[in-house]
Amino acid sequence: MPSPWGTAPERAQLRASKREAVLRVAAQIFNEKGFHATSLDEVAERLHVTKPTLYYYVKNKDEILFECVNIGLQRLEEAIRRERAGGGRAIDQLVAAMRSYVEIVTQDFGMCIIRAGEDPLPAQSRRKLRSFKAQLDRHFRELVRQGIEEGSIADCDPKIAAFTLAGALSWIGRWYRPDGPLSPEEIAQQCIALLANGLCAGRTRTCIGAGGKTRAKASAKKKTPTG
């Protein structure tokens, strides 16, 4: 007769599903109250299990936070890689990546990157997560640099542009409310329009050059005063 416990792969899948449920609920509470104000008792209560049950899936609260932030960062990395793999103009890839970024930071694990972050964790864990963040920054820099080279993005410092984009998009995860008047899609549309319009190259674009001097990009002829 078949084992009532199921096959080994089935048991592994069930355990993974339950572990993700633990992490997701913990992320929700971290986002609501902060890491230090959250207890494992609250996580267990919301899951309708005992606290000792949690230790079958996680070691401690530090591990939970690390995994929550790590999942969020992995999803951002996968989304950006997917958009880049689609090809096309760098500005189009960048806008698509920004849209995916907003979608993820308004979800439980992505929001946890912003609201809880890696600061409460031990140094080794912080270093790992910050190296993942650095990779996301490199994606943005490369796209901006490519866009400048192909002419779809205005001449600017790719590092500053990448920091500006990532900072603005990440902060959405701080102030976003699921019960707010705007959906993640609507927020993404408005924020990306503001950010991307500042990047798109145009004949009347003015950029800030080295030393803070402005460089006019306008190609239209100046009108000669009459009268």
Give, region by region, the residue ranges found by the protein language model:
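Amphipathic alpha-helical segments used for helix-helix packing
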Residues: 93, 105-124, 141, 174, ...
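Hydrophobic alpha-helical segments that form the core
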Residues: 101-102, 155-174, 186-198
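Conserved hydrophobic residue
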Residues: 35-36, 149, 153
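Hydrophobic/aromatic residues within well-ordered alpha-helical segments
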Residues: 18, 61, 72, 76, ...
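Amphipathic alpha-helical packing segments from all-alpha helical-bundle domains
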Residues: 71-77, 104, 124-150, 159-163, ...
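Hydrophobic alpha-helical connector segments
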Residues: 67, 81-107, 161-165, 208-209
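N-terminal intrinsically disordered/low-complexity leader segments
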Residues: 1-17, 203-227
